[in-house]
Amino acid sequence: SGAYGSYAERGAATGMSRWRFNCGRIKQEQMRFLADTIRKYNLTHIHFTTGQCLQMHGLDGETILQLFKECYEHGIYNRGAGGDNPNVVASILRGIDPRETFDISPYAAAISEFLMEQMFYIKIPRKFKMGIDNGFDSTPHATFKDLGFNLTKYHTFDVYACGGIGP
């Protein structure tokens, strides 16, 4: 089901599996697993989502179930990969952009992990989207999310709510 990052595709003969990487950050061992999995299952239709997740298309049900298990063993989650509990989106150059006041990665990870831990207990609106921006690349579009954080030169964040266009 969609809550677990699995969706039937048109015609219901195949499905799609969506993989969640915490704030879009893929670890080296996960990249190795990803490369091995692409070869093992001959995955040919793969793309990144705007929520910094990865989607695999054209899969049969048995493959989706097997990938669900294998992903979990490698710290890749299908739950929280979209739908009502999407991934927290963060600047793609965080931690390496020399213009950053500081690395926002720990903040992005903490928000994402908190939401993953609490998704069964807190009631946030459907399709609630969050973003955290390093203040320079605007890739997470934090100012247009339901809740966004934009790093300032003062070591603070401007907070945007409800898809606002100003601090």
Residue ranges and their predicted role:
Residues 14-157:
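Small-residue-enriched alpha-helical segments and adjacent helix-cap loops
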Residues 10-18, 165-167:
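Gly-rich Lys/Arg/Thr-decorated short loops/hinges at beta-loop-alpha junctions or inter-strand turns
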Residues 156-167:
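A structural signal for small-residue-enriched, beta-sheet-centric alpha/beta enzyme cores
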